[in-house]
Amino acid sequence: MKALILLLLGACQALQPGLEYQYRYSARVASGIPSINRQFAAAGIQADVTVQMAADYSVVVQFSNIEVGDLNKVLDCDLRAPLPIEYHPLEDYVDLLEKPFRVIMNESHVPSYMEGPEEPIWISNVRKGFVNIFRVPLFWSTELHSTKLNYGAVEETLVGRCQNWYTSMKLPVNLAEEVNVQREHFMEEDIQRDAYSSSYTTKTKSKTSSKTSSKTSSKTSSKTSKTGKTSPGQLANVPHIEDTLWSVRRTTDFDMCENLVSLQIHSSKYTEDIIQRSSVASYLIRGDTHRRIEQVVVEGTITVLTNKEQHEHVDTFTNQTLELKAVREVGEPITVTYDVHPHYDWQYDIERPQGDQFIPLEQVLTGRPVTDQIVNSIMEYIKKTVDDLSHRMEHYPAKPENLAYIIGRLVEAVANLDYPYIQTLYTHFDGKGTMQKYIFVQLVIHAGTEPAVNFAVDNLSDILFYVTFYESIGVSLRTPAPIPKIMHSLINGEEGLHHSLGLMNFATLAHDACLSEDRKHFYFDYSCGPKTTCDPELIITNFIPYLVRELGNQGKDVWQRLIYLQALSNLGTPQTINVLKPIILGVTETNIFMRTNAIWSLSAYNMHKTALSQIYEILMPIIENKGEQFEIRNIAFLTLATWGPGHAWWQQLAVSTWHDPSPQFANFVTTTIYSISDSHTKLAETVSRIKHLCKPAAPASILHSTNFFLHEYLFSEEHGSRVNFAWFASVHGAIPEEVFLRIQREFFYGYTKVLKIDGQQRGLYNLMQLMKQKMTKPQKRPQSSAQEIVSGMWEELKEKIGFTSPESASDATLWLKLDRLIYVALQYHFMEGAPIPYGMYSGKPFYDKDLNTLIAFPTEIGIPFSVLYVAEDATWLNINGNPETSMTSGKMKVNVDFIFETSQVQFVDARAHVPWSKRPAVASGVYADTQLVLPLNVHASFDMYSQEIQLSIEPTNTQKIDVIKFEFIPYTVLENNYPGDVLVIENEYKPILHGEVPLFNDKHQAFPSDVGLWIQVATEGDIHHTPSIYEIITQLFSAHTSTHIWEQSIVFDPTLSTTKTVSFTFNYVSTGGSGSLVDRGDYDDGQISQGSFDEDFGQFSQVAGGSDQDIMEVDSFGTQSQTIERIMRLQQALISSGGHVRTISVEVELQGTPTRNYEASLTWAISSSASTRSSKVQVTLIKHPAVGVLEDPYTICLNAQIVKPHFNPFFTTEDVLTANYHSTVKAELFEGETCEEAPVLLLEASFDVSSNVKERVKEAIEKGCDYSTYAPGIDIITSPLYDHSHITATWTPDFPDNLKNITYYVDDIIKASLSKKIEFDHTSAHHASRVEIDATKCIETGLWTVRTEKPYAVSIINELELPAWANPIFTPAPLATTLLYGLTVGRTPVSCTIDETKVRTADGKVFAYEPSECWNAMTLDTTFDQRGAMLVRNTGQWEVRIIWQKEGLVIDMSPTNFLVNGEPAKGTDNRYTVLHHDDSHTIVFESGTSVKVSDKVEVLLGLDHRGHTTGICGNFDGEPSNDMVGPKGCYYTDGPLFALSWASPGEGCASFMYKNLKRDVVWYQENCPHFTYEPTGVTHADALYDCTEWVYHQRTEGQYHCKALSPMPVCRPECVASHPITTSVEYECRFSGHQQQAQQQQQQQVQGTQWEECFPHFYTLTYPSSCIPQ
C-alpha cells in the first residue's frame, strides 16, 4: 500500500513528541552581474532554531543566536563557496524574532496554519520561509510495494500554488558512509542514534568526533533540556531511526504556478519573459520508518533581462541552508505566552492598509514601518533639494548632477508622504517663491500615490496644478484608488484646453486601469477592493454617458466634439461601439475628421478582441461602398487590417483593386498588402500568398495614398525599421491629407514606447502658398488698364458659364493627434503678424516619466524582491531676460541669451529588500543617463526677400563644462536609505568592471587647432567604442542601457578657446541670364532655357511681377552682403553660357583671436538646346586668410558639366525611341589659392544605351505589358536604361595627398564589402596617374560587371547589384524629372489631353468630345485668388486662350501663333517660357504648368492647382469619378453635354449659336443630379440596427468567484445568435479560501479594511460571433 508521508509538519512519523530538534539555519541573498565580473552585493542572516513537537502534534519553533551581515565586493573564483559575510548579532527586532511561534496541524496531521505574535509582517514572512522548507510531501512504499521515485505535486508555497517536481533516491552505501562521517562531526548530540548505537552503519567513531560531540552536547543540553547525555536504558521510549539516507530533490516549475503572489505597477505582459525564476531544493533525509531532515540546501535564481540582448541580464541568487545539530529529549517545553495572531495560509503576506490609512509602497512590500523619524528626514531632504534645484541655473557652469535623476528621486520622496505632510510642504513652498512652488507641484503630480493625487485634485484651483495635472495622470498614477475622484473632477470641470487634455488622458487611464483585459498590469497586488482595483461599471455608468452627452451637443464646434470622440476612442471598450456607430456610418456626422477618428477607434490595438465580428459587420459595408470618400474607405480598410483577418478577406480586397473606381483606395490597399508581405511577421505568411492578385501599385508618392509599414505588428528587428508611416493623398493640394507616423523606442526588453502621430489637414497647402507670398518681396503690378480688361473678361466668362468664385479663402485646419491626444490649429489668423509667444518658455524645469514600472514578488527566504524599470527625462530652458526682437518688411532679428539643459535617465534596479538590516536592501542593476547643457547667446537674422539667414552662437560659460555626457554603469550597492528610492543619504554605488580599472581610456580634441575651440572628447570604459555623430544625436533622444561600463563626455573650456563666437550665414541666390537676381525666362530660338518640365515640374508658384523687373535688393539690414557679391561674381562664368544660375552657400566665421572664415557653396546652371540638356555644377570650398595673419587663402573647386538628352514636356513615344541617349560627364578639380590654375584632377565619363536595350523597349511597348500606361514615353526615360559606362580619371603630381588618401580609403571599403565578387590581376603596370573604369550591365539579370584599370592592378567586379537609390542616376531623364515623376506623381501621367474625338482628364477619366468654335473651359481656378482660366476651341486648328486674371494677361496660342494681350510676344518674361516649333507652340510657366497646342491640346498642371481647378479637364484631385461635374455642380454622364456646360461664346460662335448649343445644358441643369459622397448609414439605414449587448460574464469555480476581464457579446431578446465561438477568457477570481480565512476577512471588514485575495484565471467561454434580428 502506497502512503503519502509528509516529513516534519506532514506526518507524525517525522517529528517525534518528546524530542527536541536543533538546527543551524542560514539564509543569504546576493545580487550582481556575473557575466561581467564576480562582484556581488549580498546580505545574510543565520540563527539556531529549536523545534519541539508537542503531544497534540502541534510544533513550536524558536530562533536564537541570530546574526546578520552583508558585503559588496568582488568574490573569489569559486562562486559556489560560502559568501564571506562578516556576521554580527542582530540588534533591532531581535526580541520579536526570537519569540517562539507555533504551527497547528489538522486532523490528518497536515500543517494547517501558523500562530505567532503581533509583529511586523516581514518577521512572519521570514518564519514562513523557514517553515516552508519542511513542507515536503514524499511518496514511499512498504517492503511489499516499489517506491515512486519521481512525482509532481501542486503545493501552496510562499510564492503561490505551484507545481513542484520531486525526485527521491536512496544514497549508495559508500556515499552514505561518507555522509555519515560528515554528519557525526557536525552533530552535537543525537539521542535517536546514541540510544541504538548497535544499529549504526559506522561501527566505531573517531576520538575527535566523540569528544566534540560530547562537549557540544553538554553545552547545548545545559541550555535547553538540562539533562545531559542519557544512557540507552533511559531511552526506552525514544523511537529508533534507521541509518538509511535519502537524497530528495525538489524543483519548482514557475511556468505551472497559479495564484502567484506579486505586486505589479505599470508592468507588461512580457513580464514572464523579462524575469525568469528557478528554485531547487536538495534534501538529505535519514530513516525509513521514522524520518528526519538532516540537511537542506534551497537555491533560488532570479534573472532579469535588461534589454533585447538576451545575454545581458542581472542575476540575484538566494540560498537557504538547514543543518541538524542536535536531537535530544525535551527538558523544558517552549511555551507561547502571548496572544497569538493566526496566519491561515503559507503565502507571502504584504502589509495592507486599514481603512483610509496610507502605507508607503516599500512598507507594503516589506512590512518594515516608515517611522515619523524617517518621514521628517524625507521632508527635510525635499526642502533642501528643492531649494538647491530652484537656484540651479545660477550655479552654472558648475558640474551638476543629472537633472532628471534629481527630480526623479524627489518624486519618489513625495510618493512616501501622506496627505498632511504634503499639505505642510505645500504651505512651506508657497511662501518660498514661484520657482520652489512650481517644482514641488510637479513632484506631487508625478508622485502618483493616493494622497498626492487627492491633494492635486483638491487644489486644482491653483493654476500650477490645473495646467499640468491632467497631462501626466496616465503614467504617474500608481494606484486605481483616486480614479473616481479624478473622474468626478473632470465631469464637473469647466471646458478648456487643459480640461480637454484631461478628458483624453483620463480615458486612456480608464482603459488601462479599469477596462482593459490587461488591466492587472496597471496595478496588481493579488487583492480586490476599491483601493486596489477599478470597477469597470464606474466608467460605464458615469464617464461614458457624460462623453456621449457632450458629443451629441451639436452646438459645440467640431474640434470640441472631436475631443469627446477621442476620449470615447481612448476608452477602447466595446460599450462605445453603439455610440460611435452612427458617426462611423455618417448618419449623425458628415465631417471627415469625426468619421475617420471614430473608425480608427475600432482598431485591434484599441478594442477588445471579442468585438471583431461586430466591427467587421460595421466596416465591411463602408469598404465596399463605392459612394464613400476614399479617405473613409481607406481608414476602414486600415482598421480591419489591424485585426489580422484571414486569407479570404485579403484575397477579396486584392482582387477588388483591379475594378475599384477610386485609384486612391486601390493604391492604398495594394501598398498595404505589399508592406505586410515584405515584413517578417506571422501575418506575412497569409498576405504574401495573395500579393500577386493585386493591381500593381504606383511607387510611393505624395499624390497616391500609400502605406509604408504603418501597423504596430510590422515593427520588426529583421525588417530593420522602427520608423513606420502611411498617408492618404489629398484632393485639395500636394500635401497628403492625413499622415500616420509611428516611431518605436525600446527602453528595456519587453518595454517599448511607440510615438503615434496622426496628422490631418485641410488647406495647409494654400497656407504654405500664402506664407511664401508673404516671404516674397512685393513687385510691380501690371498696368491698370490691362488689368481691368482682363478682369472684365474673367468676370464675363464666369457669368456665361454660370460659375461663382468663392468669396473668401478656405480655412486652413490642422488636427494633430499625438499619442491619443488631439491638438488643433485653425485658420490663417496666426499669419497676421502674431507676436512671438515668449510665455511658452516658462523658465522652469519640465519633468516627464516615460516608464515607471515596479514588479515585486517574494523569495524563498521570506524577503521581497523587486525590479524597478525607470525611464525619465527633464528639460529646462532658462532665458536670461526677455529676447530682443525687431521686425521690418521681410526682415527679422532675434537675440536671446539662455541656458538649455536636458537629460535622460534609464535604469533597471534589481533589489532584494533586507528588512532586518541597517542596509535595507542589496541591489544590482544597470544605469544609463544622458545630459546636454548649452549656455549660449544666439543672434539670428532672417532676410526673406534676399533669402539670407545669419546665425551667430556665443557660449556664455566662463569655466569648463560637460556639454554632452553619456554614462552606462552596471553596479552593485548596499543601500543606505529606507525607503530605498529616497536618497536622504547618498548610496555607495560600486561600478562593475571587467578588471580593476576600465580597459579603454581615450581623450582627444574634437576639432583641429585652427578652429580655435577647445572641445575635448573623453571616453573610458570596458568596450572600445567611439560613437559616431549619428549615435550621439540619437542617444539624446533615446537612451538605452548596457551591462558594459562606458562613459563619454564632450567638454568645452572657454578659457582655452581662442574662438569666442561662431557665425553661420546661409544664402540662396538665383540669377537670370541678364544678371538680375530674379527667376527669368529666356526666349532662345524657340527652345527652353530654364524653367523646363524636367527641372521645375511640381514646384510651388510664386507671385511675380511683369516683364520689366527691377533688380531685387540683396542687402541685409541696410548693409550690402559681401557673401552675395562674391556669389554673383562666381555665377558670371556660368551665366555667359546661358541658363538660370542658382547658388546655395554656407559661410562659417570663427570670431576670436584670430578670426577665421570658411565658406562652401554649390552653384548650378541648366540650359537646353533642341536635343541636349546641359547642367553645370560647381562646388567650392574656401578657407579665407585669418584676420591679421599673413597667410594665403586655400580653395578647392570642383567644376562639372553633365550633358543628357533633352525631351520636350509633351514628347511622343517616337521622340523617345529615336532620341540619342548618349550622356557625358566632365569634371575638373582645382586646388590652391584660387580656382584659376591648372586642374589637379580631370574626370570624364560617358553613359550609353545599347541597341539591345532599345529593341527590348520597343518589343515591350508593342506587347503593351511592361509599358502599359497612358504615357509610355515618360516611363521609358525615367527607367534605368543605361547599360554601359566608361569613366577615366587622370591626376597630376599636384593632386593633394589628403584627397588621395580618401580615394585609398574608399578603395579599401569596396574591396572589403565586395571581397567575394572581386578579382585582381597584378601582372602588368599601367598609366601611373590614371584610373579607367568600364562597366557593363547584363540585360537579362540587371547585374553589372565593372573592370577597373589602376596604375598597378586590374580589378574585375562580377554580378554587382546597384542599390535602388542609384537607379535614378542611370536614367536618360534628368534626375529632377525622375524623382518628381516617381516620388511626386507615382509614375502616373497627370496631363489632360484633348483631341477631336475625346478628352482624357488629368485624373484619367476619358469621355467623348465634339469640338466647336465656341470656347470650352479646360481648367478654371476655383480658389479665392481667382487666378484665371484656360479655354480651348477648334476653328480648323486648335486654339487656346489663357486668361491670367491675377497677372492681367491674356495669352492666345495656336500651332502657328502666339499673342500676349492681343499682340505678338516680344522680349522675355520671367513668368513663362515659350517653345515654338513648325507645327506647335508650347508655353511653360514658372509654376510647372505647361500647355502645348499642335494637332491636339495637352495641359500639364502644376501641383499648386491640385484639387483647385475645374473644367473639362476635371478637377485634378486624383479621383476620376468626380471629374464630370459642371459649373453649377451638376454631375454628367454624357461627355458632349458635359463639355457644353463649360462652353462660352467667342469669334465664330455667335450668341444665337451659343444659346442653341446651351439649350440642352440649361434644361439638364434645372433638374440634375449633383455629385456627392453618400455615407453608408444614409444609403443603408438598416445598417444602424444592432442586436448586440455587452456584459461581464461571471462564474463560480470551486473556491473562486470569477468575473471576466473582457466584456462579452450577448444577443438582445429579439435577436438570435449565430456561429458560436469558444475561446479562453481571463477572469479576475476572488478566493473564498478556508473557513478561518473567511472569518478573518469578516473581521477586517468590520475594522474598515476591505480586501480579498484575487488572482487571474483562464476559463473557456462560448459567445455568439454575431446576432441576427428574428
Swiss-Prot record:
Residues 198-231 have a biased composition (Low complexity). Glycosylated. Contains mannose and N-acetylglucosamine. Substrate of transglutaminase. Pfam families: Vitellogenin_N, VWD. SUPFAM superfamilies: Lipovitellin-phosvitin complex, beta-sheet shell regions (SSF56968), Lipovitellin-phosvitin complex, superhelical domain (SSF48431). Widely expressed with highest levels in gill and heart. Not expressed in hemocytes. This is Hemolymph clottable protein. GO terms for molecular function: lipid transporter activity. It comes from Penaeus monodon (Giant tiger prawn).
